[in-house]
């Protein structure tokens, strides 16, 4: 809907393939859900790297969401990777097969994430604190 007369606006969603989500310890499920469900609606799969302080929460949420998706005919949409943040995070932001990475974390790490992803012409969403 446009406020200008005779003006039309269109929104198109295109699948990117794989979306990476790196979330912090605070609100890990909310941050992941904001990104993951939009990506799933667009036809993407999601790899989630939660904070190492909330692994059980991440695994439980991922299992519940995958169960719901599978009951509706969609398999393998959400994956969670638990482990050392710098090792796994570096793999996600350097992987050219992951065109979009959403990052929540410190400003210093956000700069590093931005530079790395920009170097491979990827896209990033950041929520910095």
Segments the model singles out, each with a brief description of its role:
Residues 1-129:
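Rossmann-like NAD(P) dinucleotide-binding subdomain of oxidoreductase/dehydrogenase enzymes
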């Amino acid at each position: 809907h446009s406020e200008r007369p005779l003006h039309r606006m269109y929104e198109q969603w295109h699948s990117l393939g794989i979306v990476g989500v790196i979330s912090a310890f605070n609100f890990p499920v909310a941050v992941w859900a904001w990104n993951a469900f939009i990506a799933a609606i667009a036809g993407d799969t999601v790899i989630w790297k939660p904070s190492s302080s909330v692994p059980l929460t991440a695994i439980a949420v991922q299992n519940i969401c995958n169960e719901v998706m599978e009951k509706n005919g969609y398999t393998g949409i959400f994956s969670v990777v638990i482990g050392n943040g710098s090792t796994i995070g570096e793999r996600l932001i350097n992987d050219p097969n992951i065109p979009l990475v959403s990052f929540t974390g410190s400003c210093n790490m956000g700069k590093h994430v931005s530079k790395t992803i920009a170097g491979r012409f990827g896209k990033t969403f950041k929520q910095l604190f």
